[in-house]
Amino acid sequence: MHQLLENLSGNGMGLLIPLGLSWLIWTILLPKQQYRGKLFNDRARFEWFYTKARRRFLENGGVILNNAFKKSENSFYVMTSREVEIVLNPKYMNEVRNDDRFAVTERVDQLLHGDVPGFGIIKHSAQTHKIFSNTFQSRVVREIGTFLVPIFEEIDHFLETQWTDNEEWHAFSLHPSMVQLVSQESTRLFLGPEMCRDAHWLQASVKYIQSFFMGIDLLDSWRPIFRPLVSKFSKTGKQIRSDLAEARQILSPFIADRQARKAKGEKFNDLLQWFDDAARGAEYDAPLLILRSSMAAVHSTSDLLTKAIFEICTQPGLIDDIREEAIRVFKEHGLRQTAIQELRLTDSVLKETQRLKPLQTTAFIRLTKEDVVLSDGLEIPKGTPIRISNHHMWDPEVSEYPNADQFDGYRFYKLRQVPGQEQTAQLATVSPSHTGFGLGKHACPGRFFAATATKVILCKILLDYDLKLLDGQRPKTMWRGDAQVPDPMCQIVVRRRKEEFNLSSLLHDVK
């Protein structure tokens, strides 16, 4: 409740009484209407409301889920930062993943408040959603190899200007830097060379992403009927709409100019053009699809890169091996897609990072559209939000991976040498044992682009820089619900090194 008081501006104070009453109903009565069974993280003794239970999950969700599975093997109800959900054991993945009785789109719309003004970048018409998914699943996969040089140019430019050529040790916070880097290199693919170094656009898009997630935390405590009002009169809600309007103001004239140039016969080759190709003349909201693409790329790729760099900073031998692989592969293949496919150790390090510290510790976010009885008799009532745990990837008691709770950067490199594992052990490949990118028909459509970009970025950084953790301090574990997020304040120390092989020299060979 105090969060809303801090957010409400003067003209919203008149809503305080009705919103306060709704909050009381939501925190006391509604949870008992949402589930059948025992709530694992119920209110503590002398707690009248569920506010603190929600807050505890927001701040320590991964630990709560881990403790719950120690006491309830198959499933349990949990109060998340938003509402009561049922969390299922990973053994149900194959049964649930393609079952249309479990709605994906509707649940994602709920979680991201797609009906609230300012949050609609995820909620699209069926036609627009098809444009988005088909473009990433087919066109991006087909074209990504032709974009290696432009993407590399942006990585090179960012590191030269932001990390600099300073040969003395200097420190900075890693995660914000990775957010900026991924934003610049992904914009080269999304909007072409005119926008990828536009400081106004890069700042606006990242600012919107950050305010978007702040807004989710604010709205999660309120019933859906009141969320538009909370958003309308809160400082956070106003900031989200302002940031969205700013992003549109930048993109709209750019897109209009693009259309005028196309009418004169000029050709373009980037994500915006591919969306147009997939639309085949149908109307769609291009700025929203670009923002959605940017959010997906920046949020997930910067998370994976940050966690991977934190891990390998403590393993100089692994860093040396990655450098040796990069030199050998790029000397032989140049900046081509065949080189990316041969970066097997780099791929392994990233896949291992995602296995041990995925973006979220649960997957398969769904909403039951009808009463469901699973094969072992487990009953899930209609309208129940569900999610499936990913703990089979890192819990040594249930995982198929040896020493599953330990980081082994060579794990998947070695697995790819086992007959039958050549394909399944790759970063972009999904399987029941590794669900970092999901599983089934709803697996992340942008994972091939993410895998390519992260490998190029990691190799370029390690070839050009020495790096270590500041004072040798490993980053502390931070939770946002079930997501283990990088510590935004954790710093690394870097210095420019005299690389054994200059990747930038390959630009001339390709051109």
UniProtKB/Swiss-Prot annotation:
The record's EC number reads 1.-.-.-
Classify the protein's membrane topology as the record does. Answer: Single-pass membrane protein
The subcellular localization recorded is:
Membrane
* Cofactor(s) essential for the protein: heme
Which residues bear sugar attachments? N7, N502
Q: Which GO terms describe its cellular component?
A: membrane
The record ties this protein, via CDD domains, to: CYP503A1-like
- What biological process terms from GO does the record include? mycotoxin biosynthetic process; terpenoid biosynthetic process
Superkingdom per UniProt = Eukaryota
Pathway annotation from the record: Secondary metabolite biosynthesis; terpenoid biosynthesis
Q: Coiled coil located at which positions?
A: none
* Listed PROSITE patterns: CYTOCHROME_P450
Assigned keywords, A-Z:
Glycoprotein, Heme, Iron, Membrane, Metal-binding, Monooxygenase, Oxidoreductase, Transmembrane, Transmembrane helix
Transmembrane regions? 10-30
GO MF terms listed in the record are:
heme binding; iron ion binding; monooxygenase activity; oxidoreductase activity, acting on paired donors, with incorporation or reduction of molecular oxygen
Q: Report the enzyme's class at the first EC level.
A: oxidoreductase
Residues that bind heme, according to the entry? C444
Family membership noted in the UniProt record:
Belongs to the cytochrome P450 family.
Query: What is this protein's function per UniProt?
Result: Cytochrome P450 monooxygenase; part of the gene cluster that mediates the biosynthesis of paraherquonin, a meroterpenoid with a unique, highly congested hexacyclic molecular architecture. The first step of the pathway is the synthesis of 3,5-dimethylorsellinic acid (DMOA) by the polyketide synthase prhL.
Identify this protein by name.
Cytochrome P450 monooxygenase prhD
Q: Which organism is it from?
A: Penicillium brasilianum
